Every structure is written in C-alpha cells, then in structure tokens.
A protein has these predicted regions:
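Short, acidic/turn-prone active-site loops that include or flank metal/cofactor-
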Residues: 1, 16-19, 105-110
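Short, glycine-/small-residue-rich phosphate/pyrophosphate-handling segment
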Residues: 5-42, 116-154
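Active-site rim beta-loop-alpha module in soluble metabolic enzymes
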Residues: 19, 27-83, 90
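Catalytic cores of alpha/beta
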Residues: 89-96, 115
Length: 154
C-alpha cells in the first residue's frame, strides 16, 4: 500500500474472494490510509494455494481484468495491488492490458528486503525487539524461494 502511494494518489486492491476484505480493511486502518483506497474488488474465486492459477488462466484472468477495469474506470484507481500472491501469475498479463501500475506483492517484498540488506538497514530495535525464538531456517528458505523466482524471470 505504501508503494502504491509512491506510484499514484488512489489505489485499489484486487482480491480473489471477499473473505480477505477484513484483512485489507484492518491494514488500511492501521496505516491510516483508508482515504487513499479507491476500492477493494473481489473476483469471487476461492484461492488455490497449491496450483495457484495454473490451468485456470482462461477463467480467472478475464475476471481480474474486468475487476481491474472497474477499479480504474468507476472507482478512480491510479494503481492496482494484487491482494494475494496467489494471483502472481496474472501480473504481467494484467499489467499489459490495464494502463496503470499493477503491484505484485511477492517480488516487490523480496526486492525491498534485498535493498534493505544491501544498504545495511534494519528495523528499529527500540520498536521491534529481537525475537525470543528466531526462525533463521524459515527466513533463509523464504529468501532462497524469492531468489529462485526472480532468477526464473530473467
């Protein structure tokens, strides 16, 4: 959401299903960004965390485009956010067709973390103390998966 504000004034969130709306509403409130969200639109498709959108492109991609067009034309969104990494396969396809920036949260988060590491930036320990039980293996696995994904895109 913060990146969306760097790219435009108003943004919309595309969701797979309505069950996630409360999570975005909560985050918007915590960030004080309710007034910057043009809309949240669901395509009414239950997310598939295993096969994602594979084999469903002909069904799901047009639904995403239809919702995205409503976000831009009816709601005034200047930036779109894919509300879940389960939609990442539609990012390039949708970006080519909609005319406004489309944020893909997975690769963006990976790149931001990489930049922070390169610049030796870390969180404020005054705000966020060191965890009692660090999960180093999990963090390494997330980093490796992100790197593998980006290598496959180049």
């Amino acid at each position: 959401m913060l990146m969306a504000q760097m790219l435009g004034d108003k943004f919309s969130i595309l969701m797979m299903w309505d069950r996630w709306k409360m999570l975005y509403t909560k985050t918007l409130g915590e960030l004080g960004m309710e007034h910057k969200c043009a809309s949240m639109r669901s395509i009414g498709v239950t997310p598939d965390n295993k096969s994602l959108l594979a084999g469903k492109e002909d069904e799901v991609f047009p639904l995403l485009l239809q919702a995205a067009e409503k976000c831009v034309e009816e709601d005034g969104a200047q930036v779109l956010i894919l509300g879940s990494t389960t939609m990442h396969e539609a990012h390039f396809w949708l970006s080519e067709r909609i005319g406004v920036p489309v944020i893909n949260p997975g690769p963006l988060t990976y790149k931001l973390a990489s930049i922070a590491l390169d610049l030796n930036l870390t969180h404020s320990k005054a705000t966020w103390p060191t965890p009692l039980s660090p999960k180093h293996d999990m963090i390494r696995a997330i980093g490796a998966a992100g790197a593998a994904y980006l290598e496959g895109k180049q």
